[in-house]
């Protein structure tokens, strides 16, 4: 009898203890945030990082994740099936490539900002490059983006315009290209090599010379008649898992608030 009462008492105590213990969830609570993946040209890095934070602040529960690279690399990644919600390219050609992959809908991409080219040198300018004719001097080292990269193609267009003008000679383009020692996969790599003094000069966008970068390089402006006004298109990816949110983000890029950020970083606002 004693052992029976003891057993009953022990069972009762265990039951009470179990009832008082906090109930633990079987699994952790799911993360309620939504991640929006934006593929964007490397030249948009600084401006889009700020715009992304502003968009998150205006849309609680949304996290914007960027994939910055050369537009040609991003178009290739889209063609290979990389998950994405938005694509912002530095030219229409790579947007067309993305459309041809079937990931984008033709006619939905629109220009949201513009840019222009500038020649840069290291801050101490060891080669003493002062003007466009100096780019053709023998023995200097230049860094361009690869021709597949929008800014690389724009640089070639600039050289063609100079040759067509005729005043710097029919062989100007050939002389300049003979000085190119490296072709980079995005514009940020060109900027970095020149800023580090690994090259005497290069061609980037004016937007790449932000306050920080401007302390590390000098600029040589390219006259309007030789320059290229680069048009940047943006569109939602057709198979986005968050298509409504992707369209909301692309629409936000056209708002005055977002356009002001782009202008702050050296871009040309759309009119």
Where are these regions (language model features)?
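Periplasmic-binding protein-like
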Residues: 84-89
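A short, gly/pro- and small-residue-rich
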Residues: 101-108
């Amino acid at each position: 009898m004693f052992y029976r009462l003891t057993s009953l008492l022990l069972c009762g105590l265990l039951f009470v203890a179990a009832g008082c213990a906090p109930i633990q969830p079987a699994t952790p609570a799911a993360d309620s945030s939504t991640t929006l993946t934006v593929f964007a040209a490397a030249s948009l890095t600084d401006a889009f990082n700020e715009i992304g934070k502003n968009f998150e602040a205006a849309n609680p529960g949304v996290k914007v994740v960027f994939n910055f690279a050369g537009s040609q690399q991003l178009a290739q990644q889209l063609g290979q099936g990389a998950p994405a919600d938005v694509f912002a390219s530095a030219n229409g050609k790579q947007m067309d490539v993305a459309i041809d992959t079937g990931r984008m809908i033709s006619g939905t991409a629109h220009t949201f900002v513009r840019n222009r080219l500038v020649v840069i040198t290291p801050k101490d300018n060891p080669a003493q490059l002062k003007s466009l004719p100096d780019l053709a001097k023998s023995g200097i080292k230049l860094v361009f983006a690869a021709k597949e990269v929008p800014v690389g193609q724009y640089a070639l267009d600039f050289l063609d315009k100079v040759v067509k003008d005729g005043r710097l000679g029919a062989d100007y383009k050939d002389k300049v290209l003979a000085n190119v020692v490296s072709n980079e996969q995005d514009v940020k790599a060109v900027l970095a090599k020149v800023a580090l003094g690994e090259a005497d000069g290069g061609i980037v966008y004016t937007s790449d010379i932000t306050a920080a970068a401007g302390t590390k390089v000098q600029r040589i402006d390219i006259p309007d008649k030789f320059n290229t006004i680069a048009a940047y298109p943006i569109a939602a990816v057709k198979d986005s898992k968050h298509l409504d949110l992707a369209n909301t983000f692309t629409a936000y890029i056209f708002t005055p608030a977002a356009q002001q950020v782009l202008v702050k970083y050296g871009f040309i606002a759309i009119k």
